[in-house]
Amino acid sequence: MAAHTILASAPSHTTFSLISPFSSTPTNALSSSLQSSSFNGLSFKLSPTTQSLSLSTSAASKPLTIVAATKKAVAVLKGTSNVEGVVTLTQEDDGPTTVNVRISGLAPGKHGFHLHEFGDTTNGCMSTGPHFNPDKKTHGAPEDEVRHAGDLGNIVANTDGVAEATIVDNQIPLTGPNSVVGRALVVHELEDDLGKGGHELSPTTGNAGGRLACGVVGLTPV
């Protein structure tokens, strides 16, 4: 006889017997409708009106809830001068990253603002390396197709030396292989020419001059 056999009994009811090679006694765990059979296994007695086996769950199924994955990071910028500031980065799911900038102590006017490759500040802002550039492209403006991922353009300081800006960019995620967490944000001395100034440094740095202040991007509670 096969390991699993289905037998039909008298017309008043139908019995399904499941033969188990692992047990010599039936179990009483399912319900009172389970009966002992002449086989080593379980007998299921079915109602003659339905001739079917009904299974029910003790708990109603619950709808699937999808929670948006918000990620947030912060960088505190400091340098050798009185330039300092705080930058927050926020990303919803896999959408673009919103960067909120407030930096003080700057000369009025435009200043290059970039994400650099390393979060190393052992030698001040100089040890943060070049612009973050995973795709090995030349320097450009944030809206250009050809640009470094870390090219965030210019921020503008007012007459009080304070620069406030909101930047929305899709090349600086907070998760994944190109995550910017652990890298450094740097504010520069001069205006970034966005790769169009014709200077020998335009294709690499935008000829934005020295590095006034920098800070490492780190995750923070949402």
UniProtKB/Swiss-Prot annotation:
Zn(2+) binds at residues 131, 139, 148, 151. Its cofactor is Cu cation; Zn(2+). Coiled coil: none annotated. GO terms for biological process: removal of superoxide radicals. It is found in: Plastid, Chloroplast. Residues 1-68 form a transit peptide. It comes from the Eukaryota. Binds 1 copper ion per subunit. Disulfide bonds join 125-214. InterPro entries: SOD-like_Cu/Zn_dom_sf, SOD_Cu/Zn_/chaperone, SOD_Cu/Zn_BS, SOD_Cu_Zn_dom. Homotetramer. Belongs to the Cu-Zn superoxide dismutase family. Destroys radicals which are normally produced within the cells and which are toxic to biological systems. This is Superoxide dismutase [Cu-Zn], chloroplastic. It comes from Spinacia oleracea. The gene is SODCP.
